A protein has these predicted regions:
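Cysteine-nucleophile active-site neighborhood
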Residues: 6-72
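Amide-donor transfer/coupling interface in amidating biosynthetic enzymes
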Residues: 70-187
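Redox-cofactor binding/interface segments in oxidoreductases and associated redox assembly factors
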Residues: 2-3
């Protein structure tokens, strides 16, 4: 099962209208689903619900394509991956790696110097938490950027995304093969 994110940015989990329904689904998945992948906002929500790990709100939304390091090269999830892979990130929160590592059932599989913890799994490999967006199309970050501009927000240009940091330039995709591998390996 995949539980995906939502553009809720700084909204506290308990303030989300459907938090009770979501936690019911998360609880149900523990007994009725072989493996659950929590993506972006849902990763932080899942870590909070299942393990009490508090999210840390960022002062500025993280948006762009960042280098990530595979820490556990023997993990079946990263079979075929290079040591370093690019992954889009688009989020207003993070978790402290130290908080994750305090939980014996959790293992950090990939990190980024710029984006922090990227992929976490449970000891039994029944839950995976992915903070980024390997599923993004080439124009998804652009659409988010222009959407936020249209809302009157002042978003930063997504890092490492538009050639020459110019939003008029077509983005170059550097994460597609990693995304294909990630989801194929997860399945």
């Amino acid at each position: 099962m995949i539980i995906t994110g939502a553009p809720l940015d700084y909204t506290k989990f308990e303030d989300v209208d459907y938090w009770d329904e979501l936690t019911n689904i998360m609880e149900w998945s523990k007994k009725h689903v072989h493996c659950t992948l929590y993506m972006c906002w849902a990763a932080f929500a899942g870590l909070y619900y299942h393990y009490g790990i508090e999210r840390v709100d960022r002062e500025e939304k993280l948006s762009g394509v960042y280098k990530h390091r595979v820490l556990k090269k023997s993990s079946p999830l990263f079979r075929g991956f290079d040591d370093i892979f690019d992954c889009p990130q688009s989020r207003a929160m993070t978790v402290n790696r130290e908080d994750v590592e305090k939980i014996p059932e959790l293992e950090v599989l990939a990190v980024s110097d710029a984006a922090g913890v990227a992929v976490i799994k449970t000891e039994d490999s029944r839950q995976f938490f992915m903070t980024g967006h390997l599923e993004y199309d080439s124009d998804t970050l652009a659409k988010e950027y222009f959407r936020d501009l249209d809302k009157g927000m002042n978003p930063s240009i997504p890092a490492n995304y538009f050639p020459d940091d110019n939003p008029e330039n077509k983005p170059v995709v550097r994460w597609r093969s990693a995304g294909q591998l990630f989801y194929s390996n997860w399945l």
